[in-house]
Every structure is written in structure tokens, then in C-alpha cells.
């Protein structure tokens, strides 16, 4: 195969989906569904559990462990397949030249006949609304609340918005 290099600025492989998208969202969907079933459905099925309570710290730790296992798996595959991994940002200087500014302040020049640009996604803001990750959060922030918000308005009907609405509703938020 081709000699391959990957430049990733996030510091963890796997892109948006694995780090702040599909995977953490699905993890929280599963965990919140389990909580909801234990709290609302089990009793109707003859399974009685007293004192069910949510430990959001443990839930987030579980979600983060899922992400870590998968990112380490991607890193293992890179090593196994001899993919050079640069932690930093790449700047395209010509059709065959990339300068990589690594997170350790090292600068590396990479020449390549073939270049794939896969920039991932970034959070979009709305005009006049500042995302501060406190009371106005991005989808990334909604994946990492340290407590269940009493009320939550979700703007956007993409899959992450829908899933975050489901997660936080199951855990006790009033979601609009």
C-alpha cells in the first residue's frame, strides 16, 4: 500500500463521530435508557428496585471510557498499518507540500503525491447568540453536563440534537 500520514489537531483519533458525536451520544442514549427503564418500566414488569438514583459523574466516566477504548483502537490500527500520526495542524503550501505544526511546537514538512482533506465538523453558532458552554452549550457541551439541567431547549433537529433531547429528558430535564 501507500505510505500514509494523518494530521489530527484534536489530540485523539477518530474524528468528530468518535470523540464528540455519534459514539458519545449513543453511549449516553444507552445509559439514559437503562436509567429510564429502571426508574419507570421495571416496576410494571414485576422488578421492584427501591432508591434508584442517578450518578452523573459515573455515567460520564462510562461514556468517556467508551470513547477512550475506541480512540486507542484507532491508534493501534495506525501503528499496525504503519500510518504516521502527527498531533497538530497541517497547512497545505502546494499541491504536494504540507507543513505540519505539531502540538509539541515541532514543525515537519511532508511531501505527498496524494492528499485527502477530511476536516471533520465544527460547531455552528447562531447570529447574536454566544456559545459559552455554561448556559448556552454546543452539542459537545451537551455531551458533558456535570448535572442534569432542570430545563433544556434544543435548537436543531439533527441526530445529535434529537439524541441529546432524548438523553436529558430521560434523566429528568424538561426538554423543549
Task: Identify the meaning behind each predicted range.
Residues 146-176:
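Rossmann-like NAD(P)H-binding beta-loop-alpha module
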Residues 2-3, 8-148, 176:
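Glycine-rich flavin
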Amino acid at each position: 500500500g501507500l505510505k500514509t500520514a494523518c494530521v489530527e489537531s484534536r489530540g485523539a483519533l477518530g474524528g468528530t463521530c468518535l470523540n464528540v458525536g455519534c459514539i458519545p451520544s449513543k453511549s449516553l442514549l444507552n445509559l439514559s435508557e437503562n436509567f429510564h427503564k429502571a426508574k419507570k418500566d421495571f416496576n410494571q414488569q414485576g422488578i421492584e428496585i427501591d432508591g434508584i438514583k442517578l450518578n452523573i459523574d459515573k455515567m460520564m466516566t462510562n461514556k468517556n471510557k467508551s470513547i477512550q477504548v475506541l480512540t486507542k483502537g484507532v491508534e493501534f490500527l495506525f501503528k499496525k498499518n504503519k500510518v504516521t500520526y502527527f498531533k497538530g495542524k497541517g497547512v497545505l503550501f502546494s499541491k504536494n507540500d504540507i507543513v505540519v505544526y505539531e502540538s509539541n511546537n515541532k514543525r515537519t514538512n511532508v511531501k505527498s503525491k496524494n492528499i485527502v482533506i477530511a476536516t471533520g465538523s465544527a460547531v455552528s453558532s447562531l447570529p447574536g447568540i454566544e456559545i459559552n458552554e455554561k448556559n448556552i452549550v454546543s452539542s459537545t457541551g451537551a455531551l458533558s453536563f456535570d448535572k442534569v439541567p432542570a430545563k433544556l431547549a434544543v435548537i436543531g433537529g439533527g441526530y445529535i440534537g434529537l439524541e441529546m433531547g432524548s438523553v436529558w429528558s430521560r434523566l429528568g430535564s424538561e426538554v423543549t
